[in-house]
Amino acid sequence: AIAHRGASDYRMENTLAAFQLAAELGAEMWELDVRLSKDGVVVVCHDESLERVAGNPLRIPDATWAEISKVELLGNQRVPRLEEVIELAQRTHSGLYIELKAAEAAEHTWRILLEQNFQYAVIGSFHADWIAQLRQAKCSYPLSILIPVGVDPFEYSTVASPDIIHLCWKRASSTPHELVTKELVSRSQQQGMALVIWDEERVEVLRGLDGLPILGICSDCPEILKPWPRGSQGIPKMVCHRGANFLAPENT
């Protein structure tokens, strides 16, 4: 399970709270987005500005880390630095699936991973040329190309020779799993590229993906991707008291 921006259905996306909860819900990896501040700090934020997550129009590339760190996000959270997320991932034994949202963040991200001696990470982007540059620089981490709707994944990723093809086809149709054909899976295997699937919460779509030889599935609700832990008699080990009442009102 790859927690999309952390457990973002329950906590403000891309925050330490969202990543901590993702670990508690059983996610093996956290997907996160990185950008570079005006003074060269790699910050974890999806959008270029903080308008959507904080109601503040401050733009990441135009602001210093000191300015960004003072902004309170919705849910009483703050924008973390990449180093902070790495430290939390090390403590919780979690992996990082890092999406580059700015070209200038690429080499900084790679350098920080090396400096922190963090091994369990993937670096990806929709921009094949950014990933190609990391490949040419002999980046030691697995590289991923995110594939938008309507393009051939193999043609789109040719320039970068990625290790992973990440299909972002959630909104391609009401049954996007049907686009993950046997031919697509077979070709990706032949070319030595693993498959990662978009963020998904629809049970019927997840059932359609069940059994496919894919590396991972992203979700805002990572717990739905995890099998129930069971004892030797097949009895669930976990019983939720009044439901998952730390996420929603009890007994509802």
Named regions from a protein language model:
Residues 1-252:
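Phosphate-group recognition and catalysis centered on beta-loop-alpha active-site segments
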